[in-house]
Amino acid sequence: MHFGGAMFFTDYSISAVDLALALEERGFESIWAPEHSHIPLSRKTPFPGGGDLPKPYYDAMDPFVVLAAAGQATKTIKLGTGVALIQQRDAIQTAKLVASLDQVSNGRFLFGVGGGWNQDEMEDHGTVFESRFKLMRERIEAMKEIWTKDKAEYHGEFVDFPTMMTWPKPAQKP
C-alpha cells in the first residue's frame, strides 16, 4: 500500500517544497495538489461537502507550478495533480506542460484528472457543464496523441488540430 499527502497550496499554507521534503523524509510515495483556477461568487452548484466553500479553494496556487518546485527540491517522491481540471485547459498547452513537468522531475509526475463539480467555474472557461466529460475525454485522447507521436493530429467535436510537432515528450510512457 502507498501513502501520499494532499492539500491546497496557498500563500499562507506550508509550501509544497516543505511538505514534499517532509513527506519524502517519512517515506511517503506522493504529494498531490488540486486545481481551481478561481471561484465565481455566483454559485449554480453547491459545494459537495455542504456549507460554505473553504477559503483554500479560493486561494489555491496553480498545481503544476507548486509541483514543479517540489520536484526540484526532492529526489523520489511522486508529484500528482489531484485533480487537474483539463476541461478548463487547452489540450496542446497542457500536453506540453505535463510532459515538461514529467521530464524535469525525472518521470515522477502523476497526472490525476477529474471532471469537476463547479459549473460556474467551468462556464467562465467556456465549458458547457453538461458536456464536460466528453470534452475531457477528447482532451485526454488529444494529449495522448501528442505524447506518443512525433507528428500528432486530432480531429474531434471539441478538440481539432492538424498534423503538428511538439516537444518534449513525457519521460514516462502514457
Question: Can you name each region flagged by the protein language model?
Answer:
Residues M1-A73, K173:
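N-terminal beta1-alpha1-beta2 module of alpha/beta enzyme domains
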Residues L41, D52-L53, I77, T81, ...:
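Internal, glycine-rich beta/alpha segment that forms the wall or movable "lid"
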Residues F64-Q72, K78-Q87:
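Structural motif corresponding to the early beta-alpha repeats
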